[in-house]
């Protein structure tokens, strides 16, 4: 019975101490291998009770159904507002909370000074509401009440008339609001995009959250924000499984940034049509994160050449054969010709030469269902069965 790819990977992992995490990078145009490996990844995560997050960077963001069957999970589109990834985003009482908000705002072009003005704006809101006796949790809808200078002035006048603050305090608070109001107006426009990720409920183990980042290919800031929110959520809840689907096209630096920032204990796998079309820096991030790599047929010869270099060289000893025939008459009697004693065969072994382990032409012509497994420093060609 032939060895399956899972058995081969398991045998390689057992020989290493400590065994590397079972995190897979699949690169290539063979959709059959993507479906087989993707199905095993999802089934394994579901059996262990892990919520699944699919970052779908395919054209239109519809690759989840094409590359891997979602069996058992209840699939939820993150854009519907049913899932909360950053309920605590507006909680800026700690350095961690401030850093999380600053990271998200940076994706929308907020520099450090403007981001800190947003933090001051949120704290201004909390302080004013506390003085008014309102203890309800901070929400985007409530924060919008402070988007107008007229409303803020009215609220502060209420506090002054009720004796909760002095006239000097009212003037001071109005001055503080004037300092941060410009950043507050920009923040309100960002809140419109963040609203679907703040409301809703926390993902449970039976939920598969679909991130259609490929549908926002023309909106880089939106892609970066979605990946930043996911990375922030997974940092706080590392017991999860992340599956990245990528069609190998376009600029994908936001994916490598997310991979770099995810916790080491979080299970992450990636199925891409071409990991070697990334920049060298981005490709190194992927290769360092995924200890187990599977390479199938690649369509671009430039990528095949890079994969050829990645797989390394092997020593090849080439042999040459020569035959010397004695043409002299006395050496060509009937017995000499019959017994072959009129010729001399020579076999020469040349010095070892370094040749590619897998040539680029071979990689580009790999048949369906066949892939190169790179794990534990060894490389093998195996077939993939469902």
Question: Model-predicted segments: where are they?
Answer:
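P-loop NTPase motor domains
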Residues: 1-266, 281-282, 361-366, 372-385
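Conserved H-loop
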Residues: 57, 270-278
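Alpha-helix N-cap/helix-start and coil->helix boundary motif
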Residues: 60-61, 275, 301
């Amino acid at each position: 019975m032939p060895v399956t790819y899972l058995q081969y990977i398991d045998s390689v992992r057992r020989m290493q101490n400590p065994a590397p995490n079972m995190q897979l990078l699949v690169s290539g145009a063979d959709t059959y291998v993507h479906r087989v490996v993707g199905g095993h990844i999802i089934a394994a995560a579901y059996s262990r009770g892990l919520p699944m997050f699919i970052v779908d960077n395919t054209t239109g963001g519809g690759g989840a159904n094409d590359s891997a069957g979602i069996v058992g999970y209840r699939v939820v589109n993150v854009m519907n507002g049913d899932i909360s990834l950053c309920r605590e985003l507006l909680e800026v009482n700690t350095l961690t909370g401030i850093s999380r908000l600053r990271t998200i705002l940076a994706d929308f072009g907020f520099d450090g000074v403007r981001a800190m003005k947003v933090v001051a704006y949120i704290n201004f809101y909390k302080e004013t509401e506390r003085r008014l006796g309102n203890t309800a949790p901070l929400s985007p809808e409530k924060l919008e009440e402070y988007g107008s200078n007229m409303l803020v002035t009215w609220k502060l006048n209420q506090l002054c008339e009720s004796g909760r603050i002095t006239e000097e305090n009212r003037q001071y608070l109005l001055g503080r609001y004037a300092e941060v109001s410009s950043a507050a107006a920009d923040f309100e426009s960002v809140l419109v995009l963040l609203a679907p990720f703040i409301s809703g409920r926390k993902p449970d183990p039976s939920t598969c959250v679909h991130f259609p980042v490929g549908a926002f290919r023309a909106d880089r800031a939106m892609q970066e924000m979605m990946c930043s929110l996911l990375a922030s959520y997974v940092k706080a809840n590392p017991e999860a499984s992340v599956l990245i689907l990528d069609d190998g096209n376009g600029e994908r630096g936001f994916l490598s940034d997310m991979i770099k920032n995810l916790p080491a204990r979080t299970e992450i796998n990636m199925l891409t049509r071409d990991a070697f079309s990334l920049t060298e820096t981005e490709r190194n991030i992927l290769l360092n994160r995924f200890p187990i790599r599977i390479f199938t047929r690649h369509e671009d010869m430039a990528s095949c050449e890079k994969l050829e270099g990645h797989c390394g060289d092997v020593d090849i000893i080439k042999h040459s054969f020569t035959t010397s025939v004695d043409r002299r008459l006395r050496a060509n009697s009937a017995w000499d010709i019959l017994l072959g004693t009129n010729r001399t065969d020579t076999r020469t072994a040349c010095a070892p030469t370094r040749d590619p382990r897998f040539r680029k032409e071979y990689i580009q012509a790999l048949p369906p269902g066949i892939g190169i497994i790179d794990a534990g420093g060894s490389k093998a060609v195996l077939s993939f069965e469902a």
